[in-house]
Amino acid sequence: MHQVISATTNPAKIQAILQAFEEIFGEGSCHITPIAVESGVPEQPFGSEETRTGARNRVANARLLCPEADFWVAIEAGIDDNSTFSWVVIESVELRGESRSATLPLPAVILENVRAGDALGPVMSRYTGIDEIGRKEGAIGIFTAGKLTRSSVYHQAVILALSPFHNAVYR
C-alpha cells in the first residue's frame, strides 16, 4: 500500500488526491495522511510562479516531517490574470510530477476584494454566506452552478501530475 502524505488538511484537496491515486494505482492501494505545513508564500498567492513555489515548498516541508512516505502531494491555489487556478506538485523519492489546473475567470467584484488583501476563500464566504467555502465547493462550484467543484478540478490536475509515476517513458 502506498503511503501518501497530503500537504494539506483541506477536505476538497484530500478528496481529489485520494480519488486520483485510486484511479491510477487501484482502489485501496494507498493511505492518505493529511498534514498541515507552511507554503512559504502569502495566504493568497498571485501569479503562476508564486503559486507553484507554494506547492513545491509544501511538498518539501511534508518530506521533512514524514520522510518515510512513498508520495508527497501539495495543491496550491492562486490568482493569475483575473482567474483562479492551482498547481499540483507530487514527489516520490525519485520523481516529481507537476500540473496546473483549469482556470476559472473571477468576477470583478470578487477580484477587487482579493486584490485589496483578502484571500479568495474568505471573500467567497462573505459573498455566498457559506462558511469555509474553500474547504467545500469553492468559487468553482458557485460560478459553474455546481457543474464543477474545487475537488473535481483538482482531481484532473492530480491525475495529470501523476503521469510520470506510471508511464515509463518519463523515466
UniProtKB/Swiss-Prot annotation:
Q: What is this protein called?
A: Inosine/xanthosine triphosphatase
Cofactor binding mode, per the note?
Binds 1 divalent metal cation per subunit; can use either Mg(2+) or Mn(2+).
Q: Tell me how this protein assembles.
A: Homodimer.
Species this protein is from? Salmonella arizonae (strain ATCC BAA-731 / CDC346-86 / RSK2980)
Keyword Transmembrane helix included in the entry's annotation: no
**EC?**
3.6.1.73
List the catalytic activities from the record.
Answer: XTP + H2O = XDP + phosphate + H(+); ITP + H2O = IDP + phosphate + H(+)
Gene Ontology MF term list: ITPase activity; metal ion binding; nucleotide binding; ribonucleoside triphosphate phosphatase activity
Q: Which gene encodes it?
A: yjjX
- For the ligand (Mg(2+)), the binding residues are 38, 68
